[in-house]
């Protein structure tokens, strides 16, 4: 393992979805490469720390920072350079997000313009790797490519990469993946904790504070008091639903007194697809609360505004009216929050998400559900991957796509922060894994100089 990778904290990913959607199977395939045929419901939140090494051709191609440089160096000068991904729809089960596809298109345009003004021999692969992962040389990866698995994936997925392109192999990428129980909207409070020792008050929990033994206060998927793992340190979310409609039921079984004619049409079997909208809304609400908290903390960090000594000391100071108004504003509890910025170039935007449809190779898989997932990903500007953990189909592609999304978001944030600092503005800069930690002298974060290399 490289020294750079060992000094940084791992990428933290959270897997969210309904019951029986294949979340644990996905995590098991990634971590121990074993998937149980018998379904064992996940009751408690579980963390897995492992070294992720993408093996399939598509997963390695998605992570490649210099894909078109490699293709150009291996292609004859008489051959026209073609894009690695001519369309976001890479295959029937893989859809690139706009951010990742734009990065690939920009790389293609850059190499093509370089070829018009320089010879291909002037191209090099000495550009620094992404701060999240490192590549090996082509000599190594040409010997270690799993040919059988790659050929099988080509046949199954029907995607075509340029013949002269060989994606690199990668050093293990340290990932902390969080496996969660089935998502229950009734047991989730959309709020992100700052640390393990911060408890939610009655003004936020309301009636839930009167019953501390309820699951919402102990095993919430997202944010309830004590859920320290799913806090503001999460770098990306994997939203999972199943292509088999019968595997997840919304609303549970009917009651004895239910009338068939008056049954709610939403209480249908859809593999947990409708839950994705609820999960996304909870994530956005939680990060909206968290960003507002950060801004209010930044405004009042110079002094302890809740201290009696602070109030007495500034009682007769100048501009006391303005300061008093500011203190009252910071102390107040806001019932209406500003909407969160969804642009990935904004440091206030939530972490990247991808939609994963499991069980796509199952005999009962619904093509309509798979297509609905693609359409929803297009609407939300997310990436989409159809996987099958039993057959190990696209499991590493899903993780690679999310890591690439995080890496590209980092580039945007670093580029924007450099632009704002040159103009005199002191905007917030977020460190490694992007959006969660403020830029400080933290040994667990990414090196600032390393971040600047990726935009040269």
From Swiss-Prot:
<feature type="region of interest" description="Disordered">
    <location>
        <begin position="415"/>
        <end position="444"/>
    </location>
</feature>
<protein>
    <recommendedName>
        <fullName>Uncharacterized protein YPR084W</fullName>
    </recommendedName>
</protein>
<dbReference type="InterPro" id="IPR027417">
    <property type="entry name" value="P-loop_NTPase"/>
</dbReference>
<feature type="compositionally biased region" description="Low complexity">
    <location>
        <begin position="415"/>
        <end position="428"/>
    </location>
</feature>
């Amino acid at each position: 393992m490289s020294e750079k990778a060992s000094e940084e904290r791992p990428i933290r990913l959270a897997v969210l979805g309904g019951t029986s959607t294949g979340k644990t199977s996905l995590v098991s395939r990634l971590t121990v490469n074993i998937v149980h045929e018998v379904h064992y419901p996940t009751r408690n939140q579980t963390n897995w720390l492992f070294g992720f090494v993408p093996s399939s051709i598509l997963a390695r191609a998605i992570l490649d920072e210099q894909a078109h440089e490699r293709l150009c160096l291996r292609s004859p000068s008489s051959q026209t350079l073609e894009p690695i991904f001519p369309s976001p729809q890479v295959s029937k089960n893989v859809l690139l997000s706009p951010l990742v596809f734009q990065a690939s298109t920009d790389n293609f345009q850059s190499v093509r313009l370089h070829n018009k003004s320089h010879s291909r021999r002037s191209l090099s692969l000495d550009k620094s790797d992404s701060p999240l992962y490192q590549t090996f040389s082509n000599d190594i990866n040409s010997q270690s490519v799993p040919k059988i698995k790659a050929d099988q994936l080509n046949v199954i997925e029907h995607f075509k990469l340029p013949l002269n392109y060989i994606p690199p192999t990668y050093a293990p990428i340290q990932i902390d993946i969080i496996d969660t129980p089935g998502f229950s909207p009734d047991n989730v409070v959309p709020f992100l904790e700052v640390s393990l020792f911060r408890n939610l008050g009655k003004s936020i929990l309301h009636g839930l504070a009167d019953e501390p033994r309820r699951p919402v206060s102990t095993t919430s998927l997202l944010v309830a008091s004590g859920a320290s793992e799913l806090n503001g340190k999460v770098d990306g979310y994997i939203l999972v639903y199943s292509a088999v409609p019968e595997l997840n039921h919304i609303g549970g079984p009917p009651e004895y007194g239910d009338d068939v004619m008056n049954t709610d049409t939403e209480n249908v079997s859809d593999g947990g697809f409708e839950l994705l909208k609820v999960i996304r809304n909870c994530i956005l609400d939680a990060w909206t609360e968290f960003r507002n908290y950060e801004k209010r903390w930044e405004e009042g960090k110079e002094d302890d505004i809740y201290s009696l000594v602070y109030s007495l000391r500034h009682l007769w100071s100048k501009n006391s009216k303005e300061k008093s108004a500011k203190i009252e504003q910071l102390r107040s509890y806001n019932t209406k929050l500003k909407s969160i910025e969804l642009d990935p170039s904004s440091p206030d935007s939530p972490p990247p998400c991808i939609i994963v449809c499991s069980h796509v190779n199952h005999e009962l898989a619904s093509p309509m559900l798979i297509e609905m997932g693609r359409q929803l990903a297009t609407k939300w500007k997310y990436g989409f991957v159809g996987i099958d953990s039993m057959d190990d189909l696209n499991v590493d592609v899903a993780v690679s796509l999310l890591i690439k999304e995080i890496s590209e978001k980092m580039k945007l944030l670093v580029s924007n922060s450099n632009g704002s600092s040159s103009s005199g503005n002191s905007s917030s800069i977020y460190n490694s894994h992007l959006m969660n930690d403020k830029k400080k002298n933290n040994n667990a974060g990414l090196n600032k100089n390393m971040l600047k290399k990726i935009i040269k």
